Amino acid sequence: MMCPCQYKRVIESILKNSGFPYEEFQRMTLDAFETTTEEQTAMKNLANRFIKEDGYWMGVFGASGAGKTHICIAVCQELVKRYRCSFKYMSYRSMMRQLRSFIFDDEKYSDMMHDLIETDVLYIDDLLKFSLDQKGDIIQDELRILYDIVNERYLRKKKTILSSEYTMKEIVQMDEALGSRMRELIGDYGIKCSGSNYRLGGKKNG
């Protein structure tokens, strides 16, 4: 049995090594998520249901300012606290830039992909941000990398949380194979947000 002080150190270590700013975790909890609109309440209900029902994939899509990052980080840290599981945060744009730069460096590329594929919980934030070419298609290098991550995590039954300013319908239109796979994996654990009421007042969900 782990004593409270040991448990606290383990959780702190997991969160500090996740890639997400540690000081933000205390602010981005489920308890701190504001629920003054029906949409906010629906987001929080989805998060609680995903945790309670031990879901594998969750997606929060739609407008900037809707509190997508807050609710997703809240879910991730709740899973860490419950199961002491490994967790990685992937800021899509910066992580994809690194992965593309390592394509011809097998060791660095493999190490980074291994971390993203094998971690118990992965949160991909701002999915597909700035990822379209002039024709409106997903850049092929990024599409291949993303599909590898999605497929390998599916095969390993790893918990994966996604947030994006694009809707699920828009992602399917960008690439039907990738979008359809994501939609299938997310199933009932997805929500589209408008964000229209979120950052107008003094308090906000980040």
Predicted regions span which residues?
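A short, basic N-terminal segment
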Residues: 1-41, 190, 201-206
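Loop/turn-to-beta-strand initiation segments
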Residues: 85, 118-121, 156-162
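Short glycine-rich substrate-engagement loop in P-loop NTPases that contacts/grips substrate
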Residues: 41-44, 80-118
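Pre-Walker A (pre-P-loop) alpha-helix and adjacent loop at the N terminus of AAA/AAA+ ATPase modules
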Residues: 32-58
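P-loop NTPase Walker A phosphate-binding motif
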Residues: 70-84
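Walker B catalytic acidic pair
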Residues: 125-127
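Walker A/P-loop nucleotide-binding motif
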Residues: 55-73
